Design a protein with these regions (language model features):
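Alpha-helical membrane segments and immediately flanking helix-loop junctions
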Residues: 54-86, 112-130, 134, 151, ...
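Flexible loop linkers connecting adjacent transmembrane helices
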Residues: 35-60, 82, 88-92, 104-137, ...
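Membrane-interface alpha-helices at helix entry/exit sites of multi-pass transporters
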Residues: 54-60, 89-97, 131-135, 139-147, ...
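Helix-loop-helix module between adjacent transmembrane segments
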Residues: 25-30, 98-123, 129-130, 134-164, ...
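Extracellular/periplasmic helix-exit of transmembrane alpha-helices
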Residues: 30, 108-117, 222-240, 254, ...
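N-terminal alpha-helical transmembrane segments of multi-pass membrane transport
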Residues: 1-74, 84-91, 102, 427-467
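Membrane-interface loop-to-helix entry segments
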Residues: 21-28, 32-45, 165-170, 181-229, ...
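Transmembrane helix-loop junctions in multi-pass membrane proteins
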Residues: 2, 18, 32-37, 75-80, ...
Length: 467
């Protein structure tokens, strides 16, 4: 009964409501900001390497790595392969579309997070959708609802799913026992995650800023090797992606399993553009202008979908291995690499899944620290945070042994609720984003390092950081 209800909500959200909202808002911000994905790409790359104002402050690069740690996860492997298995090859195209359009929404939401952020007693900055919902719309109630939805999504839904996806990569090993092994792997992952979480936000930032660049670069290099070894298949694969993407039978027939719906679902799960998660990391960065971090988070969407998700799709499709009922998700990716790289392939995917899942868990819990600080109106005391982190680690343990389809559906619904709150809000505040972008570009044209003050854009609401 519960699964039927969740599935019905999912189908409604992703076959009607969210498709219109996500694509519509992406087009709106892309046009209103005059295609920043192309026009300001160079500025985004420059902003990543800027040093923070203080030695203990979070840099743009570290904020990028935390948000990318959450974006770049098991969804880049399992999500992509599942989308292709269910929606067909054309779903890859729709993942690209939602990433390109969504990157403009990511620019908007992260710029707003910077504008309305607050500085805590510990010297760190806190912000995100909850902060700009209350400051600009004067609705703390809606802000708290968003926080609760996001905590449920990330600390439980996404983390449980990441744990399941990780243990599933071991299913082909001789020692794997379906009744025992998932719980053992879940227990080990929960213990390691708990150790990092109990070290607090600084430990999370340090771990993710080390692991994310390393694993991303290695993953892309291996995918390029696989494509080069199967280069003869590439033209037909690309042709098939575009052909199925615009095949109206594939797009609309049985919409729950269509190319468009699966591409948007899994693309959104992977890159998180517009749902209000990354702004929590973006707000923590110490920068001289809010738009700088907006551009950095736009870049994070590109890294996640246009690089890493595409890498998975191409590795699988050029290999010639056809997915089947018993060969979906991570096992399909492992089989594809095994055909090209031999026994090294499955082990590489296993290692990649361990790193992807681990950094996802840490990035997700970093977000929850920010949300709990907002709900409590101050940093929660140590006992509360210790208890929350233990419960979060327990969710990681439980997720390893749960049923995959139910976990996907629950995560999709929770993610959809976040998008339904955040996207209308950033649309209402779009003029603030446009004014900040105009101020940034005006200073760039004068060959200045952009510095922001709220009076520069005649901001009516008082800001805590930029006055």
């Amino acid at each position: 009964m519960f699964e039927t209800i969740i599935d019905a909500i999912n189908t409604f959200l992703y076959s009607k409501l969210l498709i219109v909202i996500l694509i519509g808002s992406g087009i709106y911000f892309t046009v209103r900001t005059r295609f920043p994905q192309v026009r300001l790409f160079k500025n985004a790359c420059s902003a990543v390497m800027e040093k923070p104002e203080g030695d203990e402050s979070v840099s743009s690069f570290q904020a990028l790595m935390v948000s990318t740690a959450s974006r770049v996860g098991t969804g880049n492997i399992v999500g992509v392969s599942s989308a292709i298995c269910i929606g067909g090859v054309g779903s890859v195209f729709w993942m690209w579309i939602i990433a390109i359009l969504g990157s403009a929404s990511a620019l908007a939401e992260s710029t707003l997070a910077q504008i309305y952020k607050k500085k805590g007693k510990d010297g760190q900055c806190y912000g995100g959708p909850a902060y700009y919902i209350e400051a600009a719309l004067h609705s703390r109630g809606l802000a708290v609802v968003f926080c609760i939805a996001m905590i449920l999504t990330y600390a439980f839904g996404f983390n449980m799913l990441a744990s399941y996806n990780l243990q599933s990569t071991f299913s082909g090993q001789p020692f794997y026992n379906a009744e025992i092994t998932p719980w053992i792997i879940g227990g080990i992952l929960a213990l390691v995650t708990g150790w990092c979480l109990l070290g607090g936000g600084n430990r999370i930032v340090k771990v993710t800023s080390t692991l994310v660049p390393f694993m991303g670069i290695v993953y892309i290099l291996i995918s390029l090797l696989v494509v080069v070894l199967n280069i003869g298949q590439l033209p037909s694969v690309l042709a098939q992606i575009f052909e199925e993407a615009f095949d109206f039978k594939a797009i609309f027939a049985g919409f729950a399993g269509s190319a468009m719906m699966q591409g948007i679902r899994r693309g959104l799960y992977s890159n998180e553009a517009g749902i209000g998660s990354a702004p929590n990391a973006a707000a923590s960065a110490m920068v001289s202008h809010p738009v700088k971090q907006g551009l950095v988070q736009m870049l994070s969407v590109f890294i996640d979908t246009l690089l890493l998700c595409t890498a998975t799709a191409m590795m699988c499709l050029v290999s010639g291995v056809t997915p089947a009922k018993e060969l979906q998700g991570a096992p399909w990716v492992q089989a594809a690499l095994h055909k090209t790289l031999g026994s090294f392939g499955p082990y590489f995917i296993m290692i990649a899944m361990v790193l992807f899942a681990f950094t996802t868990l840490l990035g997700n819990c970093f977000y929850c620290d920010n949300l709990l600080t907002y709900i409590h109106k101050k940093q929660p005391d140590r006992k509360f945070m210790t208890g929350f982190r233990i419960v979060s680690a327990l969710a990681v343990f439980l997720g390893a042994g749960m049923e995959m389809t139910l976990l996907w559906h629950i995560s999709d619904v929770l993610m959809g609720v976040m998008a339904l709150i955040n996207i209308p809000v950033i649309l209402l505040l779009s003029n603030t984003v446009l004014k900040a972008l105009k101020d940034y570009e005006g200073q760039i044209r004068q060959k200045k390092n952009p510095v922001f003050f709220s009076k520069n854009i005649d901001l009516k609401q008082k800001t805590d950081y930029w006055n």
